[in-house]
Amino acid sequence: MFLGKITKRVMTKGRIILLVLAVAVIAELAAQEHTDTLRTKALPEVEVEARRVIRQGTTDSYFPSKAQRERSANAFSLLGNLHLPGIVVDQVERTLNYTRGGGRVALEINGKPSNIDELLSLPVSRLKKVQLVRVPSVKYGTDVAVVINVVAGRGDSGVGLGLNAMNALTTNYNDDALWFRFNTGVHELGVNYNFKLNGIDKAFTRTNEHINNPTGLMVNRKIDGRFSGGNYRDDFLSLYYTLNRTNRRTIDVRTSLDWDRFPQRAIDATVDDGSSYTMRTLNESDERQLGLKVYYEERFSARNVLNVWLAANAFANKYQRGFSSPTANKHYDVDGKKQSARLETEFSHTFSPACKLAVGWQQSLAHTSNTYVSLQNTNFNYDDNSQYAFAQACGSLGKLTYSLGMGYARDAVWQRGKGFEHYAWRPKFYVQYAFNDIWQIDYNLSSTTSLPSLAQMTAYERQDDDQRTTMGNPSLRPFTTYRHWLSLNANKGIFSFMAFGMYEYNHGSIVDMLAITPMGTVQQSWTNDGQYKHLEIGIYCGLNLLGEHLQVYAEPKYVTFISRATLRHNRSNFCLQLGASGWVKKWGFNGYFRTAMESMEGDMLEHRTGTSDVNVNYAFRNVHVKLGWRNLFSCEGPATRKILETTNARYETVQGNLGFANMVYVGLSWSFFKGKQTKRRKESRQVDASFDSGIVK
């Protein structure tokens, strides 16, 4: 009977959603009655060449200039030279981060899920444009803030190979990659290999504790920790095959092996609580991951497209942890295994250049087994089963552009016969009004669902130090966050401008909890007692000067948090980002500066110190050399400070790496190609627009 009520309610809401989508499509068809459907004229070539950024609905298309292409070693370095608003392209650590609220950056190549390793091996000559999807469709789920889609042409026939090296001169930091490909024009075979070797001897951790124990006595402790031991190493090997029949069919098959390991390392901490003694924590990990990804795209016609993506992963993780002090000694091993798979399908139909309807289905399965080996072995098994269905329609009515999407998700997690099933609607609404060719205003409404991690749900007590333990909470439940976004945008010649505001809130969020035991020790866990409000207001300004040989941008913003768990917290701060890049003949430079940023959840405040980077690069044919200086005049480099303040305790922990303070690094990119290069005409038309690995904890 209960399932019947749920089914009836779901079907009723589903009919309403489908009716709304149908009305939107019919309205669009009426508005397009006098157009020539897919044969509508493209923008004149002169206009596209004059405007490097073209906004169309939720997507901004960036057309790289000749100077930007010549000074970019690969597609990833080109992303950095484009200065995409709200995106931080870290050329040293090779990451993409979003600076406006939460969420990650999803990366695609020609609409196919991709990663940075693939961008490092993608020649700039194949790149047509970069699309920044500011409002991702409902198919991307809950944690994607923006999507970067690199539109590339088919590869040249022949053999190519290349090297991308990033190495520090002042500390032990190495991130190097090799790639090889053989292309016949339609078929392509390739190999990517990435090697990382990083030292830990300059890493540090510091903690200040203030605890009110049950007797009313305030206990203060200072802990100063230093790392020693083996270096972190990661080897990643990927083999792939791609079939690309232009405008008809694409098949991409990739298999990968990732070996991530950390030889035994020690954290030696000096404790000062009136007396002085030493604690030692030993850690060792060895994780191997085998992955398979298959992407299939079929263009039945210019109007109808089917996309299918299948991913499967197998993990094996061995983790050892030991702790010792004058009053406590505990050691355990974790033998973890995980098998997971994910299937995504999407079918889209284009009614006109401005009207499109997409529907899809996603299914994911995972099984995790963690065995804690100690005096008494303890086993935890987890089973995840999730389904997600979605539909989205987008179109335009005169100067008004809209996108209406709805998804319905079922998430189920089970451990030891207990767990939860969570059902959630995920609406997404977007509307844009264009005052003219220069000014537009956007509004976006969306909701996301956050699930508890396996570590947060594992009821195994871990000894952090002689006074503190951590234990998961199997009763945790998902929670929903609602977000409103409003922006005013302008693009005119050399000038780009955006004024934006973002407000998000949730109830019942997962937050840290501290409990004081009768013995005066502290146990950390998690609860669903959080409430959260987050507001951001900012401005972005960008300029292209000296015939696009100099680019500068600035983004100041004001951020405020109101968070409640055991206490009510109100925190505000001002953030500023500045950046510039320029070219003179074969020489170029890049630089950026970011002030400190903060975020808050429950009673936990996270403060990330500011960072800076400046580098000079030289390009000669297929060789690009870069010399850089990171975190100038910084004493400790980038560090993260976490402050957890409750009614009976206050913890302040700082973690960082001195190796990234005043770090001097050198980068080298080289590529070689032998074969027949295809002549490519200039792009003169607009082209319309996770797999969660679940590392064993």
Question: Which residues fall in each region the model found?
Answer:
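N-terminal periplasmic accessory domains that precede
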Residues: 45-47, 75-80, 94-97, 117, ...
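Extracytoplasmic beta-strand/coil segments of soluble accessory domains associated
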Residues: 76-112
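Short acidic/polar hinge/loop motifs at secondary-structure boundaries
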Residues: 111-137, 178-180, 239
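Outer membrane beta-barrel strand-and-loop segments of large Gram-negative receptors
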Residues: 340-342, 388, 473, 477, ...
